[in-house]
């Protein structure tokens, strides 16, 4: 079976959870004898290449087509996020070249959801994996500007104005969408976004969500696709080796692994340590050079600088992951946004490490109090401190033999493959 996997960014330039998942499923497809080509956007901020250009940059043995897209081709940044009709001809060229039996969309930001119905019109099956809230939220996080949680586009999208584009509060929307950079054009694009995204998503042949929470949230926002199925994330076989470690140790070794962003909320873990009574240490793993979060990371380091128990260990690669978890007694996931199932949680379970997580989103589906970790109210440093103390006081919670087996991607790929084939 010939397959085209479409994603908004890809290795080696970008390697967050969505890219990792796309690569893992591509490897599973290859193991099954299927042929995968990846189409990824190449975000061009400075016009270092022709405005739009298709070029190849193989990765991990896969053919990877990169579509260079100078952002100013569509200066309306609100519209560019979800609709770029000028890319349709380039996409047709890719389909003519690859001739796939199915296209699997992993993320479509800055490419455009209109590629879903276009794929169907061209006689190719279109499958979508939901990996975050981009189809619902222009900020893709379902977090309002003040950090509060959102349940979906309020007031048909009008509620998104104050949150995502506050400077448009007094603007008058244009009559039709256009690529023009003007208040009226941007407001029209923002108001049209919910309906366009919903209409395009519902035209897919099949839609997959990694958690019941995500599937139910999309259904509540009018995106109850008749072929919506839940396929939990899995790990590649052998990704994490479980070390023979006697847990818990003294001091209790806590770890945070992930992007140092406000919604991943390592600051909650830093604040919680001040209230924890038993001896404890925290290693924070994540890139310290993130331009988008430079101010946040600076404040985080300042908050921790006088606490010798806290170490900033930087990022690590896949080869080092097993050792990172071997050195850890419990993983802390203090996210303040709706997580699905972060891969780092599955990696922790595979390593025999319990997880202390926010009681939000898909985390509630995999972290079970007293079995493989503990839950606490999101954003509550005192609640996290109490959860850490509960775990520290119960050595039996560190018995990894009681953890449920971590799924691999094989079962999920079987369901994807059935969707590719139309069954």
What are these regions (language model features)?
Residues 333, 345, 354-357:
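Short hydrophobic beta-strand element within catalytic cores of glycosyltransferases
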Residues 369-370, 374-381, 390-395:
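Conserved acidic donor-binding segment of nucleotide-sugar-dependent glycosyltransferases
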Residues 47-56, 220, 283-309, 320:
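Short, structured helix-loop element that forms part of the nucleotide-activated donor/catalytic region
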Residues 219, 225-229, 234-251, 323:
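Acidic anion/phosphate-binding donor-loop and adjacent secondary structure
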Residues 395-423:
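A charged, aromatic-enriched C-terminal amphipathic alpha-helix characteristic of glycosyltransferases
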Residues 20, 261-275:
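A conserved mid-protein helix/loop that constitutes part of the nucleotide-sugar donor-binding site
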Residues 42, 213, 234:
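Carbohydrate-associated surface elements
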Residues 1-57, 63, 96, 122, ...:
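N-terminal subdomain of nucleotide-sugar transferases
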